Amino acid sequence: MIGRISGQLAEKNPPEVLVDCNGVGYEVLVPMSTFYNLPGLGEKVSLLTHFVVREDAQILYGFGSATERAAFRQLIKISGVGPRTALSVLSGMSVEELAQAVTHQEAGRIIKVPGIGKKTAERLLLELKGKLGADIGVQVSVSSDSQSDILQALVALGYSDRDAALALKALPKDIGVSDGIKLALKALAK
C-alpha cells in the first residue's frame, strides 16, 4: 500500500495532479478541497494517499489531511459508493460539512453534490451515522434543535451552507425557529 507521496508538483488538471518523485511521475486523483490548497507547479508537495487496485487499473487518490483520507475510507466502505463517488462527495463539501450533515441527518445537503441522488444520500447518512466526527478527528458543532431547523430551512430555500451558517451565527442562540428563519432571511436579503 502506498500511504504517502512526496515530490515536485509537475501538472495540475482537476481532479488529477502529477507528482514527480525522482523522475517517476505519479498520477494522483485529489478532491477539489485538496486541489485548491496545492502549491504552484514545480514546488514540493506531499499528499497522503489511498491506493486502489482493480482488475483494469491501479489508482492513487491523494489527500491534504488525514481527516480527508479517513472520511474517504469511510465513504468507500459503503455499498454502492466507489472511490469516484467518494471523491465527488469530498469535492462537493468539506469533511466538517459532511460530518455535520450526518450528525443532523440532512440529506438535502448531500444531494447537492453532483452525482449523489436521494437514495445514495440517505444510504450515506445511515451508514456514516456515528462513524464520522470524533472517530476521524472532526469537531462537529452541536447546536440547538431550533438552530438546526433554521439551517435546514435556509438550505432547503436554496442558500449555500456557508451563507446559511453565517446568517445563523448572527442570530441569538435562544431564538425560535420561525423568528429565526425570518431574521436570517432578512439578513441574507441585504
Swiss-Prot record:
NCBIfam families: ruvA. The keyword Secreted does not apply. Homotetramer. Forms an RuvA(8)-RuvB(12)-Holliday junction (HJ) complex. HJ DNA is sandwiched between 2 RuvA tetramers; dsDNA enters through RuvA and exits via RuvB. An RuvB hexamer assembles on each DNA strand where it exits the tetramer. Each RuvB hexamer is contacted by two RuvA subunits (via domain III) on 2 adjacent RuvB subunits; this complex drives branch migration. In the full resolvosome a probable DNA-RuvA(4)-RuvB(12)-RuvC(2) complex forms which resolves the HJ. Residues 137-141 are annotated as: Flexible linker. SUPFAM superfamilies: DNA helicase RuvA subunit, C-terminal domain, Nucleic acid-binding proteins, RuvA domain 2-like. Residues 65-137 are annotated as: Domain II. It comes from the Bacteria. Pfam families: HHH_5, RuvA_C, RuvA_N. This is Holliday junction branch migration complex subunit RuvA. Residues 1-64 are annotated as: Domain I. It comes from Polaromonas sp. (strain JS666 / ATCC BAA-500). Residues 142-190 are annotated as: Domain III. The RuvA-RuvB-RuvC complex processes Holliday junction (HJ) DNA during genetic recombination and DNA repair, while the RuvA-RuvB complex plays an important role in the rescue of blocked DNA replication forks via replication fork reversal (RFR). RuvA specifically binds to HJ cruciform DNA, conferring on it an open structure. The RuvB hexamer acts as an ATP-dependent pump, pulling dsDNA into and through the RuvAB complex. HJ branch migration allows RuvC to scan DNA until it finds its consensus sequence, where it cleaves and resolves the cruciform DNA. GO terms for biological process: DNA recombination; DNA repair. Has three domains with a flexible linker between the domains II and III and assumes an 'L' shape. Domain III is highly mobile and contacts RuvB. One of its GO terms (cellular component) is cytoplasm. The gene is ruvA. InterPro entries: DNA_helicase_Holl-junc_RuvA_I, Hlx-hairpin-Hlx_DNA-bd_motif, NA-bd_OB-fold, RuvA, RuvA_2-like, RuvA_C, RuvA_C_sf. It is found in: Cytoplasm. Keywords: Cytoplasm, DNA damage, DNA recombination, DNA repair, DNA-binding. SMART domains: HhH1 (SM00278). Belongs to the RuvA family. One of its GO terms (molecular function) is ATP binding.
